[in-house]
Amino acid sequence: MPARRRTGDLTSGPIPRTLLLFALPVLGSNVLQSLNGSINAVWVGRFLGESALTATSNANLVLFLILGTVFGIGMAATILVAQSVGARDLPEARRIVGTSATFFFFVSVVFAVCGWIWVDAILNTLGTPADALPLARSYLRIIFVAVPMMNLLSFVMTVLRGAGDSRTPFIFMALAVVLDIVFNPLLIRGIGPFPELGIAGSATATLIGQTVSVIAILVVLYARKHPLRLAGANLALLRPDPALLRIVVFKGVPMGLQMIVISAAALTVMGIVNSYGSQVAAAYGIAAQLWTYIQMPALAIGAAVSSMAAQNVGAGRWDRIGRVAASGVGFNLVLTGALVALLWLFDRPILGLFLSSDSAAIDIAAHINTAASWSFILFGITIVLFATVRATGAVMPPLFILVISVLIVRTGFAYFMRGVIGEEALWWSFPAGSITSLVLAAAYYRFGGWRTLHMIENRPAAGEPPDTGLGVPRGRANMAPETPNG
C-alpha cells in the first residue's frame, strides 16, 4: 500500500476541510481529557470537600509542569515524523520514532522517581494551604507513579498525529477517560469490592486508565502492522541515534521550555492565589478547569496546523503553509469565541456543578471568568502562529515571546499590581499577557526568518524553491519511493 495511504496525507486537498477534519478528533481528545479532569473534580469536591479540591488543583499544576517538560521532545519528534511522512521517507520516520521513544520514556521515569522523592518540597514551594497539604501529598505521589504511562501514551498519540492519523489517538484517549471516570467514585468511596482510598483513589483511577490505554493502543498498532511500528530488525532503532537525538533534544527542549514557562507562570499565580485562602484558591481552581475547555479549540487547531504544515514542509508544498495558518486562525476565532460567549451566559449553572450552591467561591469564580476568559481568544491566535513557525524548526523565538508575555508581563502584572488593585491584578494579568504574546507572535510570523529554517541539515528551508523534476528541492530527490513499507 502506498506510503501516503498507510499514513494520513495532509499535503493535498482543500486546506480548510482537511484541517478541520484532522482537528476534530484532536478536539474530541482534548474535550475528553478536560471532561475527565472536570468530572474528577466534581467527585473530589462533592465527596471530599474544598480542601481536597484545592489539593488536586495544586497537584495538577505540578503534573502540568512535568508533562510540559517532556512535551517538547514529543513535539520535536512529531514534527520530524510529519516532515518524513510528507517526504514519503518512512524508514527515516521509524528512526525518529525509535530514538525519541527511548529518550522520552527514560526522561519520564527520571521525573517520576524524583517527583516521588521530593513531593513535599514541591508542594511547600507551591505554598499549598496547610489543610490541603496531606491530601495533595497522597494524590501527587500516585500521580508520579502514573507519569511514565501518561507520557508514553501522549508520545504515541502525538507521533500518530504527525503521521496524519488523529482518529486512533481519539479512540484510546476515550478509553483512558472512561476508565478514569468509572473508577474514580469506586475507589474514592470504596463502592462494592473496591477499597476506600479517598483522594488517593482518584489518582489510582488515573493510573489504571492510562496504563490500560497505552497497552491497548500498542497492541492495536502492532496488530494492524502500522508502518511506524518497530518490529523485528527495526527494534534496533530503539537504540538512540546520536545525530537524531541531538536534533530532537536541541529542538525539543525549547518547545518543552515553552510549556515550563506557562507552568511557571501558573505556579506563580497559584502561589499568590493561595495566599488569599482556600476559598479563593478553590474558585480559581474551578475557573482554571473551565479555561481548559475554552483553550481546547485553539490547542486542537494548533496541533493540526503543526502536523499539516510540517508534512507540507517535507513535501515541498510551501504554497500551502500560509493558507494553513490563515485557516487555523479563522477556526480559532469562531470556535474559541463561541465557547467564551457560552461561558459568560451560563457560568453560574456550570460552576454549581463543582461547588454547593451556597458556596461563596461561586461568586468569586464567576468574577474571575468575566475578567480573564476573553483573553484566551487572543492567546489562541498565538498558539496557531507558533504551531506554523515551529513546523520549520523555529523554536527559540516562540520561547522568547512566551518568556516576555507570560513570565514577565503576566506574572509581573499579577505581583506588582495587586498592591494597587488587590486580587483583581491576578485576573487581569491574563489579558495583559495574551495581548503582549499576540502582538509579538504576529510580528515574528510576518517579519521573522522562520521560512528559511530547517530541522535536518540535508532538508532545505521552506524558502528554497524546488529545483528537480519531482517538484521538490534537490535534497529530496533521493526520497523513499511511494512503495509498500512494513
Model-identified regions with their sequence ranges:
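Transmembrane helical elements of multi-pass membrane transporters/channels
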Residues: 21-40, 142, 209-213, 217, ...
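Transmembrane alpha-helix boundary and packing residues in multipass membrane permease domains
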Residues: 26, 30, 42, 46, ...
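Small-residue-rich hydrophobic transmembrane alpha-helices
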Residues: 53-113, 150-169, 283-345, 379-401
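Short runs within selected transmembrane alpha-helices of multi-pass transporters and secretion channels
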Residues: 74, 143-161, 169-177, 202-217, ...
